[in-house]
Amino acid sequence: MKIISEGETKLMVPEESTLSKKDTVFYNPVMETNRDISVSVVQSFLDDFKRDEFLMCDPLGGSGARGIRYAKELKFNGDLKVSIGDINPSAVKMIKENLKLNELENVEVFHEDANVLLSKNFKVFNVVDLDPFGSPVPYLDSGIRASLTKGGLLCMTATDTAVLCGAYRKTCIRKYNAVPLKGDKELAVRLMIGYAVKMASKYDIGLKPIFSHVTDHYARTFMVTERGAGKADSAIENLGYIRQDSEQKSFKTFEEGSEKGYAGPFYLGEISDKNIVQNALNTAKTRNYSKRAVNILEMISRESEINQVGCFDIHELCSFIKKLVPPVNDIMENLKENGFKVTRVHYNPYGLKTDAELSDLVVLISEYHSKKY
């Protein structure tokens, strides 16, 4: 074992990890960025929380890194309590050692299956964070029911992004009851949100995303639970289908239904709230969290200003129109000069989010080549 630091927290973790299910206790150092962002986003949510008690649950605790960082680093004037669970007795032992290391008394540890722990706590938690190895689907129903407090927060990670991005089409249809679409990683998190919205609606619960990102091997989202059939109906109205021809996306609403050539359903509404993102960014900067976490938050802050589903991949677009790829910064400058909003996206170095149409981009790239060459 070794002791490392993440944020303001000390953690005892395995000396070596294969980052697979073979590990006795799972700890992934690559996910420090994920945890930095998670603490920042939940802190932003917590800043507007009006009750005296704030109850959180990390039912898939592993080494306890996520839940313990929440317990140690979240600032709250009231009573903040965290429940951490794991089915693995070795993990439970390590979580308890990490609690001693950080001198925390506001955490309760459970040696229990995640679904059992969540089911025993129906409508109890203000925040449930599902961070599994693979898909969150097996835990989603229990997670929704455990976070049905008024204005609760459901956070979830999916590491099966190859499935969500369309590499395993049949698996996606089977697991997420949706047809995936290849090419744009943002659609992975939108598909995951869409599935969660459908699951929650049967309980007359609407889910409203306040922060989402796709980084490395995972997709992650944070969704506020809003009670009432009307809220569930409003959330469903944000679902729809997408057809992509070359770089052009076409959309159909959920009620219109899908037809041949369309994928989905995807969540087509806003997936990140501007104020939440900005407050999370301020938190990450103030606490000197990892530079990478700050960079991702900065990029998503700019993305949240532009209402576009996905992005335009400049390399793919230029390949389609048979043009050499101009410098991305030059394309951005030309778009701005023509009155369009534009920003790079956090998940694709060649991706641009803009309010320009595909035809506008084609014209600008063609004009760039005619002037340059």
From Swiss-Prot:
Its EC number is 2.1.1.216. PROSITE patterns: SAM_MT_TRM1 (PS51626). One of its GO terms (molecular function) is tRNA binding. Transmembrane segments: none annotated. The gene is trm1. Signal peptide: none annotated. The keyword RNA-binding applies. S-adenosyl-L-methionine binds at residues 35, 66, 86, 113-114. The keyword rRNA-binding does not apply. It is an enzyme of class 2 (transferase). Residues 2-365 form the Trm1 methyltransferase domain. The lineage of its organism: Archaea, Methanobacteriati, Methanobacteriota, Methanomada group, Methanococci. GO terms for biological process: tRNA N2-guanine methylation. It catalyses: guanosine(26) in tRNA + 2 S-adenosyl-L-methionine = N(2)-dimethylguanosine(26) in tRNA + 2 S-adenosyl-L-homocysteine + 2 H(+). Dimethylates a single guanine residue at position 26 of a number of tRNAs using S-adenosyl-L-methionine as donor of the methyl groups. Belongs to the class I-like SAM-binding methyltransferase superfamily. Trm1 family. Keywords: Methyltransferase, RNA-binding, S-adenosyl-L-methionine, Transferase, tRNA processing, tRNA-binding. This is tRNA (guanine(26)-N(2))-dimethyltransferase.
